[in-house]
Amino acid sequence: MSPTSDDADVLFRDGLVTSETVSLAKVYGIHHPLDRMAVTANGNLQRLFSSYYDAPVRVIVDYSRPIVNHNSNHHQWERRVHLTVFDQTFCTADSTVQVHSKEAQALVESGTVGLGQLFRYLDILPEFALQAAGPTPEGGFWRNYTLDCPLVTCSIREVFCPGVWDLQKPQQQSTRDRDR
């Protein structure tokens, strides 16, 4: 769902994400409180999920490839990553990254830095703008947003699996079961 321009103005003026008359649930159809927290995460999603599960979140890069654009002076990449916890993918993120500096370009080209980490390396808090969000037919949710600063601009679409807050750590096999 995309908010109307009036709703968006109310929701996101000065970082405000709810108001007395407008809510994320009403505008985007996102009703679970933890889903709403994830929808408004501004570059710290990996840390939020790691804290929730008390386990490391891995970012698995499917691809990160340059986009050739002869009409632009900026370097661009398209990326797809999967965020996993307990070896289970809970989010797939597709993004377009446009860099405006050599420092940001080197970090993106390295392929070792996630987008949230990129801003930390650059010591910059990006401007977060939620463009749209909503539930998926399968029971998960999605969001489209941008992270922007003078050195880099990221346009990101994330799709979260159903039951994203109910993932289970695989059961450890007991010593007795392994020895059989």
Task: Label each region the model flagged.
Residues 2-180:
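Composition-driven recognition of glycine/serine/threonine/acidic- and proline-rich low-complexity segments
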